Amino acid sequence: MRIGLLTEGGYPYVSGDARLWCDRLVRGLAQHEFDVYALSRSEHQEDEGWTPLSPNVRRVRTASLWMAGDDGAILGRRARRRFTEHFGELAAVLCGASGSVPVTGGASTSGENSQAGGAPTPEADRFGNALYGLAELAREEGGLAGALRSEAAVRALERACRAPGAHRAAREARVPDLLAVAAYLERALRPLSLDWYEDDGLGAVDLCHAASGGPAALPGLLARHFTGVPLLVTEYGVRLRTHYLTAPDAPPAVRSLLAAFHGGLAAEAYGKAEVVTAGNTHARRWQERCGADREKLRTVYPGMDARPFAEVGESVECADPDALVWIGRVEPAKDLVSLLHAFAEVRKQEPKARLRIVGAPAGTEGAAYLAHCRALAAQLFPDEAEGPHAAGHNPVSFEEVGGPELPVPADAYASGAVTVLSSVVEGFPISLVEAMLCGRATVSTDVGAVVEVIGGTGLVVPPRNPRALAEACVALLRDPERRERLGAAARARALELFTVEQNIEAFHSIYLEIVSRAPVRRVVLDAAGEPLPFAVPAEARVPVRWAAPAPGLAARGGPGWAGGGPVRATTPVTAPERAR
């Protein structure tokens, strides 16, 4: 089949998010063709170029979210009036005037997919109606780039904030807040003006797969709206949660309005998608609170390449039995301060213990945090010397992967007997899975998907509790047999659940499920414009009854294509073109 892979700030760019996952997915499903539609986030990302493409990537189309383009569209009076109406309706939903898109609970904004059989309210459809109204206007007029940056858009947003029924944060929005929100909406809605939704674009694929929520899912929603192509949404991090975590210092009005936008877009994507996959149960709970129907949800764990860690995982224990290892990006969310205080307690009971902190800082904030941690380590653990003529040493070391002692990540995990994770905020703990693949016993804080990943193969303590963290580390340092048992169990669990192979197989099954239940009805034409005989198998015209769902799942209706909906004529697809 032919898949339209939708990304934002990710594949195929070298520095993209989830680049490795997308590349492994495309290469692992070599029997399918992929058309990649990528939204870039920065000029730097574009300048770094693309990762080498798999042979089954048919073509790549890109668009920018960081640079304001000019589509040259000039709206007439009637078009401007339509734009003001639809954008004003979208702004009213975000401001909560006369109802708002739910971002909690279980109701979907889609009329087709209401939770627990409940009928969707008219207010719940307002976000989608306004969004598709803008999309149809953009398609007719050739784009909305100028309109979304116009004074009319800001004034429509201001009217919505001042309207009766608007929530408190919206009513308190000032001019800088309105300008910031309008600028963000203009960037996020740029996919409305793209020419990706014709019969030679996303209209020619069998399935759209959005590799994340947010703007990446928007082209999939529009392809479904205009051409009926089914949509699959995959999220390893929920955009609404990311917004809350990354914008703590934004003005309340900006935080509130953008949270409403992310929640509304997420609810619309979940409602219209055939299947929604989450990377873990933690993300799945967020999806449910944003309106996802439980019957559509699947949990597909990220796939990791186990081969680089095989030698360490299968070798006889050769690590320093007194060493604790922490590996990851250095940033405040990792709470290395608590780890250092916990290690001070460990040293009181195990004087030979050492702590290796392996990782590079994440941005300027991470660099400042790393400097603070170095200063704290020097204060807590003054350099110790065995005698008056010996050089002193610190039991805490700060290192990075790639040096002579730790050329690759597997060497870092192999250097310690216990791997520690001390985060206060965590999504899917990649470093923890790598430690499990290396057969290492782990001590982790109970955040994000840690408990789900660890199962019963490691010790879990509350976050921000240095004493509990220290006690767990001491318990494992003193019991090598227990470390060995936990490490073996951890490696077995990781190989069973978190490998590339299981990830690829899961998505292959989901692709087949979606295309079999929601195929795109097309009339294929030959060079003369006549219907091409036998272009579609006879089975596509036969209504069938699907097997009963598994026990405990609600029964689903028959396939949508059996109802005899209108068919859409398309021109034949040309020979595969080179990726550009």
Model-assigned labels for residue ranges:
Residues 459-466, 475-481:
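Conserved acidic donor-binding segment of nucleotide-sugar-dependent glycosyltransferases
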Residues 441-444:
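Short hydrophobic beta-strand element within catalytic cores of glycosyltransferases
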Residues 268-271, 390-416, 437, 467-471:
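Short acidic alpha-helix that forms the nucleotide-activated donor recognition element
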Residues 468, 482-497, 503-513, 523-527:
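A short, well-ordered alpha-helix in the C-terminal region of glycosyltransferases
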